[in-house]
UniProtKB/Swiss-Prot annotation:
Name under which the protein is recorded: U-actitoxin-Avd3h
Lineage of the organism: Eukaryota, Metazoa, Cnidaria, Anthozoa, Hexacorallia
Subcellular locations according to the entry: Secreted; Nematocyst
Site (Reactive bond for trypsin): 31-32
Pfam family, one: Kunitz_BPTI
Organism (species): Anemonia viridis (Snakelocks anemone)
InterPro entries: Kunitz_BPTI (IPR002223), Kunitz_BPTI_sf (IPR036880), Prtase_inh_Kunz-CS (IPR020901), TFPI/VKTCI-like (IPR050098)
GO terms under cellular component: extracellular region; nematocyst
Function: Dual-function toxin that inhibits both the serine protease trypsin (Kd=30 nM) and voltage-gated potassium channels Kv1.2/KCNA2 (IC(50)=2800 nM).
Keyword Ribosomal protein recorded: no
Family recorded in the similarity comment: Belongs to the venom Kunitz-type family. Sea anemone type 2 potassium channel toxin subfamily.
PANTHER family linked to this entry: BPTI_KUNITZ INHIBITOR DOMAIN-CONTAINING PROTEIN, KUNITZ-TYPE PROTEASE INHIBITOR-RELATED
Length: 82
């Protein structure tokens, strides 16, 4: 049992994905238009989106660099636009 726990902890760290990065993109119900980035677990990239300003989640970053650092993504030429 302890072996399995250690295995999964090491596997999670080796993939470098923070649990917050697996959360879905949430635009929120408010009507502000803040450019933000989120980690898209399907494309395995940080992508740009427009955040409404309220009721978001932790998968919401001010910059592409912050998203890539927190979510363990290597830089790519340019972010995908949504």
């Amino acid at each position: 049992m302890v072996f399995l726990l250690c295995f999964f902890l090491v596997a999670d760290v080796s993939y470098g994905i923070n649990g917050d990065c697996e959360l879905p993109k949430v635009v929120g119900p408010c009507r502000a238009r803040f450019p933000r980035y989120y980690y898209n677990s399907s494309s395995k990239r940080c992508e740009k989106f427009i955040y409404g300003g309220c009721r978001g989640n932790a998968n919401n970053f001010h910059t592409l660099e912050e998203c890539e650092k927190v979510c363990g993504v290597r830089s790519r030429d340019s972010p995908k636009e949504n």
